[in-house]
């Protein structure tokens, strides 16, 4: 059997074997595992002298799995086998590769998990004694001066580590039952064996201290102590002799990292402040680290982490004693802890923080962050007035020691913020990583110092920025700009604790203004070709433009900087595109009122960027023209400049639009509408619409954009004429390209941007626009957007008679277009199902047994847009449009749709809610055949629609009862969505009752009592109760009754 297993293992783990053969080999090994005598087979295979290391690993893997599955007899057999393996009698595991030794330890730990402690019936309570004897380390319980087996100690320690991974490792999420068992095993170990284990570890460390050959094993001991410390009695480890023994291993290169990690784990153990302070006093860490001198970076990382851990624990002691400042003992402990931080830990932390490798620097951040947070509670003079920091600070005078610490810290932060010599500015990943992991954290520390003592911050950052601006390196200039940004943000966020009214004239603000003046006059900045400097410069200018306004630089001089190769004409695409956005952003924020001459000169400089050029490989609709998307920012910025200019004369707009119009004419004249031509036409329409949006934004204050009176007062007649011409151009273009979806999108976009300027003057153009859209072959998503566009028009122009007439003429064609598209979507869904294709399907989230296809989802989205369109007539008091002579014939189609639903539609809650809301409002406003909306100016213009009242009654009443009670609708009143639906149905029935007047002659009540209830054989007593409640209860009370009624009837 062993020979067959060996062959199977060799094949299964071979890199050259055929896949089919490897599969057979793996199946053979699995079958052996599942066999009745698997334990005996794999123990025999493990002990076979011919078994390879990989074979031993497979055998041990199988035995580990079997240890968790067998009964007492199998466990006893496996226990004996494991002991023989640990004694080196079988399996050859002592001298095996590390992965085999680890797997052996895992096997033994699984036996521990299955047999140790009361939770396992005390099947193997002598586990650790037996393992210690088997591995030859039992003598280390009492003394270091004994002979021991180094390979056996290695095995013993790996077993200990495996056991901790099994029961003590907190990185794994375990079930509640597993956690209970783990806790029971740890309790048993604490009582019986932990003291023995800690003795063996300590004596092993003492025995190996001078044995360079065994330092690898010492690493295992230190790892065991570090991993067990979280759940064993701290007093077993924390005593001067034990800590000294561990501490000594900082002296040896091979053990430094493991020793530092072990000490960090010990330090993180929860203890009373006094006890923790005593432990920290044992370490004399500062002296030890200084003695080590130059070591590897990895060692420096661990030493930095260890130092930071010491500082963090001292800082925690400070915080705890500060919160319990009533006792003299707490004050004494706090003073001692702070003294250690300032005089011992801080100098070392700052040394590590200033290390050339960022990985070392980062280890110090937890301590620095915590300690600064504590210092804010004592000393903070800044912080926004009324903020938690300002209110909670004791505002104690800053002593010399803490002043020196804060000064040294901010200097180190500033030094470490600079990109080092190895960093290349064009390595975006490296730059981003440094900013996110190091620089951003240092900025927070810098800000905290500003809050604690604004004077220290001001003095040092001003020196730093001045020094950097004099530097020649791109690293100096980049950091200067970054620090200016930080300084400006500290003013914006009022880290200095100034009164709001005093900020603009404060010393920090004046200093920032000086810095802005300096950077605008700094020739080295503008001579730099570094993208980081170029982008960060303009980010600074735009973000903190308010400081420039006091420098004497006018708007046109700043905007002119953008119109140079340093910015918008830069060779670097990244800089160029970002500058386009920032140019627009600056204009949007400042809205400069330029005179015509200055604006004309600026537009002349920008002219090359105002031409729409089609880049190669973007003719395909699926391609994204990133350059053009960013170019739109320029068009918007130019529009704002034109809208905000000093004079109300807009001939300058022609200079921007004429080249675009000429290009559109070329597109229209092209005999073949190639993809390139279509894309160019789309881009030009988008540019025109974006310019229009910019003009409006420049003309009207941002907080008044939707105020009709303000808009009307600010829009000059000449501008309306310009925009009317734009509308005409767009319509002509659209008429030639209306079969292209991208053109339809761009047309709708542009038209919507003309509306705020043209107002009612856009209605004649809109009539033609809508007609062309209705002639187009629209996709579902386009129709959704188009209906939204129409709804917005109803909202904007509902009081305009021309708009009323427009929709009177076009309402019926729009409705027909919607239902034609609904029918098309349904047909596509049927064809897909009939052809046995696989449309995407998913169960609806409400748990109903309804399958939703893509076509059904498209239909639902279209219906929602359609219902919102109908609701716009209700919301804007023009429901009379549905009763005009032109639209009466389409009304039956509309109402039929609102009064009939499939089971799948019933469970689309959002769509149903919209639909029923429309139906409720229709019942309220023309449920009697006459328009009852007193706000509708045309309500009395038309004759009543005969028979409409009876139609509503005979259709609404059955609908209200069929939806909750018909089996095919699967209506579950306990489901939240169905509960919402029931509430809407109750409102519908109540609205029907209300519009039919006096209870004594109410046609809806009469239909219920004389026709519907008898027809469905409704009990007489319940009928009277229902009628009575409907007639007397208000809407809310009837809703509550109707829900309980459904529950009663379905129970």
UniProtKB/Swiss-Prot annotation:
It comes from the Eukaryota. The keyword tRNA-binding applies. GO terms for biological process: tRNA processing; tRNA re-export from nucleus. GO terms for molecular function: small GTPase binding; tRNA binding. It is found in: Nucleus; Cytoplasm. SUPFAM superfamilies: ARM repeat. Keywords: Cytoplasm, Nucleus, RNA-binding, Transport, tRNA processing, tRNA-binding. GO terms for cellular component: cytoplasm; nuclear matrix; nuclear pore. Belongs to the exportin family. tRNA nucleus export receptor which facilitates tRNA translocation across the nuclear pore complex. Involved in pre-tRNA splicing, probably by affecting the interaction of pre-tRNA with splicing endonuclease. This is Exportin-T. It comes from Eremothecium gossypii (strain ATCC 10895 / CBS 109.51 / FGSC 9923 / NRRL Y-1056). The lineage of its organism: Eukaryota, Fungi, Dikarya, Ascomycota, Saccharomycotina. The gene is LOS1.
